[in-house]
């Protein structure tokens, strides 16, 4: 994994924030509610490291959405949510109550769709910026 400078990470975070804005607009249209998203943290790591971190996560149960990508750049993008936040997102999308402590199959599919919307918007914004430079 390439070592990124703080300036490069800041620039990429700004690009991803633009993608998050696009994703937030799409999710707002889906839910009929204003959705605000930001890039809380950005980390470059290997797939094995992500898997290890997910298995070792004991403080908060996490839900992950993975989006492989190929083209100008290739890799896997992971979007991680604390499980309780993922249930909030699903409730907003499905406009129904999901059990407090469980992700049903429909809820999992909805969360995957939300993750795909967010990750695709971010990756598309990144690719568009790379094509322009």
Question: Locations of the language-model features?
Answer:
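Composition-driven recognition of glycine/serine/threonine/acidic- and proline-rich low-complexity segments
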Residues: 1-133
